[in-house]
Amino acid sequence: MNKGLIGKKIGMTQIFADDGRRIPVTVVEAGPCVVIQKKTKEKDGYNAIQVGFDAKEAAKANSATVGHCKAAGSGAFSFFRELRVDNVDSYNVGDVLNADLFAAGDVIDVTGTSIGKGFQGVIKRWGFKGGRSSHGSRFHRAPGSIGCSATPSRVFKNKKMPGQLGNERVTVQRLKVVRVDAADNLILVGGAIPGSTNGLVFIKDSVKAKK
């Protein structure tokens, strides 16, 4: 059964394993998420559930959002996400999904929005080496030639050039759940995940985990 939760990145810390190893972890507030809608293959063409996260007052949401959440018997939510599932009958509208959906040792994929760095040059954005810093050199951080004039007389697609860095959807795969605090809905994920503090993330079962 596929599992997934919407969460919020709290920050990074470190814990120590029983054998004394120091493990860097990212703390994620995962859930509670409420099942808002069920989609079936017969009606919608695929099996999925829609979950809501970060409850807010109905007065602060538009009428369409309030009406959509009414069937779940809960107020409005700030964020929604669909999750493909194998057996949609395992869920009911109004079910609450918490951090205990995952357990220590699970392998997961985490999706978030990377921190935006603004407009950056090719050295920071793509890791170009750059030119010499010595006296007399007139080539330091410039990208250099981007193509020939006669042939091909154009710049190829996907040419590495200066531009916007960060602020894009990033998925880090095959991370390990180190610890789960069900009481506070916290999941400790080994390593780093995309996004800034309090950034929205989506946790789901890894698609490349070894069976």
Curated annotation (Swiss-Prot):
> InterPro entries annotated for this entry?
Ribosomal_uL3, Ribosomal_uL3_bac/org-type, Ribosomal_uL3_CS, Transl_B-barrel_sf
Q: Report the record's Gene Ontology biological process terms.
A: translation
Q: Which GO terms describe its molecular function?
A: rRNA binding; structural constituent of ribosome
Record-linked PROSITE patterns: RIBOSOMAL_L3 (PS00474)
GO CC, one annotated term = cytosolic large ribosomal subunit
One Pfam family cited in the UniProt record for this chain: Ribosomal_L3
The UniProt keyword set, sorted, is:
Ribonucleoprotein, Ribosomal protein, RNA-binding, rRNA-binding
Q: What is the purpose of this protein?
A: One of the primary rRNA binding proteins, it binds directly near the 3'-end of the 23S rRNA, where it nucleates assembly of the 50S subunit.
Quaternary structure (record): Part of the 50S ribosomal subunit. Forms a cluster with proteins L14 and L19.
Q: Which family does it belong to?
A: Belongs to the universal ribosomal protein uL3 family.
Q: State the name under which the record lists this protein.
A: Large ribosomal subunit protein uL3
